[in-house]
Amino acid sequence: MCADSAGWVPILEADCLNTKLKDMNVDYLFKAVLSLETMEECYSFFEDLCTVPELKALSQRLEVAKMLSEGCVYSDIVSKTGASTATISRVNRSLNYGSDGYKVVFERVKG
C-alpha cells in the first residue's frame, strides 16, 4: 500500500486498482466511509450520498458475491436476489479476477 503526498488515505498499488478510478475525490470518499463508526452513521451517510436504487444495487452486488462465494448457482441467485445474469457474471468475474476486495470483506464481516 502507499499514500499520496497530500496525505490522503492509503491507496492500493496500481496493479490492484483501476487507475481510471484512483483520484483525490475517490480517496476522499473512501476516507469518509472509513470515518463512519456506527451502523446509524452509515445509514445517514449513504442515504445522503446515494439514491435508494443505487444503494440497493450496491447491496445486491454484495449479496450476489456472498452467494457465489458460498457456491450458489446462478438460477438460485437470480431467484433470491432478482439480479440479472449480467450482474451475476460481472460479480463473478470480480471474485475470480479482481482485487480480492470481496474476499477481504467476507473475512472481516460476519452475518
Predicted segments with their positions:
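Short, amphipathic alpha-helical "recognition" segments used to contact nucleic acids or chromatin
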Residues: 58-72
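General marker for long, soluble alpha-helical cores
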Residues: 75, 103, 108-111
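Major-groove recognition helix of helix-turn-helix-like DNA-binding domains
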Residues: 64, 88-95
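Short alpha-helical "recognition helix" segments of helix-turn-helix
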Residues: 76-81, 88
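Residues at alpha-helix boundaries and the short loops/turns that link adjacent helices
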Residues: 36-40, 52, 71
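Short, Lys/Arg-enriched anionic-surface-contact patches
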Residues: 41-60, 110
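Short, solvent-exposed alpha-helical "recognition" segments
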Residues: 93-106
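General nucleic-acid-binding
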Residues: 1-36
